[in-house]
Amino acid sequence: TEFFSWRISMTILGGICLFCAFGFLKLLPNSRNFIAQQGLSFKFHLHAWYAHLSHIRLLKIYGIGFLLTSVFVTLFNYVTFRLFAAPYHLSQTQISLIFLSYSLGIISSSIAGNIADRIGKKQMMILGFSCMLLGVLLTLSASLFLIILGIGCVTTGFFIAHAIASSRVGELATSSKGHATSLYLLFYYLGSSIVGAYGGNIWQSHGWNGIVILNIFLILIALIVIFSIKPLHSPSVTH
């Protein structure tokens, strides 16, 4: 929107989305193992969701998903306001380029599984949140370089922890895996919606230091939850 109206920008984005959707439709291979189930009642869905929510290890993973997006979205939502203001006065285009740090997620999430096979998934999630904690602390600096480096660390840690947490859902749920995954995504987006919005109050009242304190608090809660997760020894959810 720095060079065009918001209408033109949205039209361009819409066109890109349509192009990607068409490519997805044409290039995605057919499912090999999917078997459609007929006659599933609403009661069945409620029972499946309740069973997953009643399982403490799955519930902790859902909480981790909530905390992940809470930190990630809150940081990205309000760091833009900080960089628009003095002493940085970055333009919309310059700030948008910082979001290229998302590409770090392609690398970190790809290698997370291989490293987790060697050191363990619990340790990998701890590593991911520790990386996020380091990144959040780096954004306290007045140096633009360190702020951007901090954003990169948060992004890397986020995708590491998310890749491991989401894979744990499939491992812990031995049946109705689609229901288990849908609950993870529900908590995942609730974090970005609730805490991401609440962060605006923190930003207005306490500035960037308040955002940092909020994110540190959330990361510490996540680490406590991760440490409390017991190893998987037996099937977790049965119907």
Language model: regions and residue ranges:
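C-terminal transmembrane helical hairpin of 12-TM major facilitator-type secondary transporters
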Residues: 120-165
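C-terminal membrane-cytosol helix-exit motif in multi-pass small-molecule transporters
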Residues: 9, 14-36, 225-229
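Flexible cytoplasmic inter-helical loops of multi-pass small-molecule transporters
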Residues: 25-51, 237-239
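A late C-terminal transmembrane helix in Major Facilitator Superfamily
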Residues: 171-208, 214-215
